[in-house]
Amino acid sequence: MPKLLRLLIWLAVALFGVLAVATIALHRGEQINAMWLVIAAACTYALGYRFYSKFIAAKVLALDTLRATPAERLENGRDFVPTNKWVVFGHHFAAIAGPGPLVGPVLAAQFGYLPGTLWVLAGAVFGGCVQDFVILLFSVRRDGKSLTKMAKEEIGRVGGFVAYVAIISIIIILLAVAALIVVNALKASPWGTFTIAMTIPIALLMGLYLRRVRPGKVLETSILGFVLVMLAIWGGQGASQSPAVAHYFTLTAPTLAILIIVYGFAASAVPVWLLLAPRDYLSTFVKLGTIALLALGIVAMRPTLHMPALTRFVDGSGPVFAGKIFPFAFITIACGAISGFHALISSGTTPKLVSRETETRIVGYGAMMAESMVAIMATIAACVLQPGTYFAINSPAGIVGQAPKTAAATISNWGFPVTAAEMHSLAQAVGEQTLYNRTGGAPAFAVGMAHIFSHSLGGQSVTALWYHFAIMFEALFILTVLDAGTRVGRFMVQDALGHVWEPLGRTSWYPSILSTSALIVAAWGYFLWQGVKDPLGGINSLWPLFGISNQLLATVALCVATTIVIKMGKARYVPVTLVPLVWLVSVTFTASYHKVFDPNPRIGFLAHTQLLATGPATSANARLIFNDRLDALVTGVLIMMVALILLESTLEWMRVLTGRKQARVQEAPFVTTRFATEEQG
């Protein structure tokens, strides 16, 4: 294609993107079409990948086509396995795309569609995609080392130890809650349970087919997996309608918890090519396929966003959660813009699969862009609902009341009309008894998704079908995070125990694999069990910490990335990682202060404790007081640990930049790849 024509095409993309963003940002008092959000996202991501990621790849990271990756040099058939870049992309996307991009934007929609949309677009292109890309490349150049090992080697022993304690604690909590979401989504749902269960033997079949039967035949394996998944989804509907079959797949929460714990252990212990990679690749079919279908549904339906650009709740008095746009919108929407958990995957399983350095761009930067588009779709799904419906679903009973008429009247008085009859009709349409007080974001996303699909594919008669498909989709979306997160946690435990007894640190020694897998699964499994059995909250009480914890992880990752960029002699490019780091520090530290010390009991943990102390001395109140104090303690400890890492990092930067310390990176020796003569992929 001639250079002038390419220039004109990209200029048109840029102008179209500016027009879309301007339309989103400047319209006040009138509704806009959801297509503008899709256009703005597509143009922003296209420009970001084409120009910004290319700049980072060439100038900051200097990707080398001749350098062998650890997947090639350390290949062992278990953890280090050279893998097709699209399979790696699928695994990475499936691993990073968890509850965040689905739930966060739905909850943040209480501010209106504008704040969340702008944060998702800017945060992803300049923050999240950059973090995933650079951490992945730096781990690849260090034999697939974990984030904690890189922190120890590049920042210092103290920073590395603190990073380890902070990260492993957050991983355990994150995995427990991810598992709890899956349990809540699948309990008493034979369709979802059947479909999710069938993805396991399908993944095993794909892994064996690609490894033993038809090595390298990715397209054949993809077609096989896609057909089988579609059959599993169709079979799930049949299973739910057959009393004899549904009996075996209608499971209680404790039963599901046990099964998920067993599955988590197996996923961590078996070779990555047998279950983890093919299952994540398989899940990516459903994830990307559903998101693409949702995008097509939006294009076909061209729905109107009924939620205004900004609502009255920007003042912090929102019913879904309390707090102003800054900092709470940026904490609530984590994974869709930037997520510290991604850095764990980028320095965990993924760098052990990448075949070429140049593939880190599409895997690291590209997969995060895909996840960010998921967040845009979630925003649309929430905002196409009538605001009254949205707030009826997402507002807790303690705010709007438990009786349908009371809740409807309260929400209508806010200026968002809704009636009890409308909510009853909607609940019947999706096959639920009630949709009031279905907090957490996931039910609202499912209702919005069913609304779009039923208006563009199949009509109103299949609304319930699409709603339950969305519930299954959310469970599948989240379960892959459990797979990869458990494996990352296992690697971290092996790193630590290797200092106690060297064989325990060997990722290829099977007794070490089994014992460390059992330890990490037991840790998050304990909290999962508490959450399932404890009606007063259990692990649910830690939900307010997740947004803060996730962004604190990103802060640690960007500290490591900035340190390495400086030591590479690329200090002039340090704003690439330093600017998002400074922003995250301002957001997370401000949010943490408010969550601990804010005098509003709906925001501050300690203020809520004081309020409960004035109430009746019941066991429920005593448990809630304990949970609030625990939340405040955990928040304070995490902030202090991250502050120490920031201090250690800053001191290291100053030593290197002033010449008091020689700049030396801890990269593995250069080895020429055997793929050097192949055409660059």
Where are these regions (language model features)?
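Extracellular loop-to-transmembrane helix junctions
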Residues: 31-50, 108-138, 148, 191-199, ...
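Transmembrane helix-loop junctions in multi-pass membrane proteins
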Residues: 18-31, 102, 114, 172-188, ...
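Extracellular/periplasmic helix-exit of transmembrane alpha-helices
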Residues: 298-314, 369-447, 484, 529-534
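Membrane-interface "cap" regions at the ends of multi-pass membrane proteins
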Residues: 1-14, 47-102, 284, 323-328
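Membrane-interface helix-loop-helix modules in multi-pass membrane proteins
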Residues: 22-28, 33, 79-142, 153-157, ...
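Loop-to-transmembrane helix boundary motifs in multi-pass membrane proteins
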Residues: 154-172, 364-376, 439-441, 460-470, ...
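Flexible loop linkers connecting adjacent transmembrane helices
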Residues: 53-81, 107, 121, 130-159, ...
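Membrane-interface loop-to-helix entry segments
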Residues: 35-42, 47-60, 166, 190-233, ...
